[in-house]
Amino acid sequence: TSCETHQICGRKIIYRDGTTNTQEIDYCRCSGDTDCPKDDVNEISFVDWSYWEVSYYTCLTQAGNYHYCNEGAAVQPGAGPIIYRQNNVEHPYKMNCRCNPCWINKARCCTPGT
């Protein structure tokens, strides 16, 4: 899947729930963005896959293209922490619900032509 009006940030991110759901996704940014995300996380292990789905789509339904969760509190409060796995070490990390850059293979969250 190409990024169409978006630009690929030049890496893949693997989403896992620890069991069966593993997916390689093009990580894109809109052409209007100045840079790519600055985290170095390559593998992200979510406590619960369905929780990630709910959180992600809830994020997409928020008003505007740029929506952030508040200091690590997911869009579904109290649902539990999101764990990033980096270098085989699990650690809590602020959930980024920004809808642009977007995960183009999951949903198109940027306005066409922007």
UniProtKB/Swiss-Prot annotation:
Subcellular location, principal: secreted
PTM annotation, UniProt: Contains 6 disulfide bonds.
Organism domain of life: Eukaryota
One annotated Gene Ontology cellular component of this protein: extracellular region
This protein's UniProt keywords: Disulfide bond, Ion channel impairing toxin, Neurotoxin, Secreted, Toxin
Subcellular location: Secreted
Segments traversing the membrane: none
Tissue specificity statement from the Swiss-Prot or TrEMBL entry: Expressed by the venom duct.
Any GO molecular function: toxin activity
Function, as annotated: Acts as a neurotoxin by inhibiting an ion channel.
Entry remark concerning the domains of this protein: The cysteine framework is C-C-C-C-C-C-C-C-C-C-CC.
Protein name, as recorded: Turripeptide OL22
